[in-house]
Amino acid sequence: MEVENIRLGSLSLDCAEPTPLAAFWAALLGGEVAFTSDNFVAVKTERMWVSAVKVDDYRPPTWPGSDLPKQMHLDLAVDNLAESEAEAVRLGAVKLEFQPAPDRYIVLLDPAGHPFCLTTQIPQ
């Protein structure tokens, strides 16, 4: 049962450098940086907020390895995998060599090393 008036409001990502990570997500999601401090940068998008939070001694996940596993990742719904991948890489994402389902999902890392997927498999 969906609880009325509860919606996804924000995603917070740990990182070593909040400013470039926030700039990446703002550009990729068509958002804008709305708040900045030394340890936190908030990006406002059309539907939600994404924030980059500075963490001392931050270490990115090593997925698909297990030394430091990912705790979560984003699946971004896109219309065209190739075009969306090219834009994400142009903005600073890195495409992983390991691609478990490249015809449906493209796995990338954001500038702080967080894995995320581009996919055409999420209905509108």
Stretches found by the model and what they are:
Residues 1-22, 28, 71-78, 119-124:
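N-terminal beta-strand motif that seeds the catalytic metal site of vicinal oxygen chelate
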Residues 1-16, 34-35, 42, 44, 50-51, 62-83, 104-109, ...:
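Vicinal oxygen chelate
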Residues 26-27, 86-91:
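Short amphipathic alpha-helices in soluble, non-transmembrane regions
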Residues 36-39, 69-71:
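Intrinsically disordered, low-complexity, positively biased terminal segments
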Residues 56-60:
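Short amphipathic beta-strand starts and helix->beta connectors
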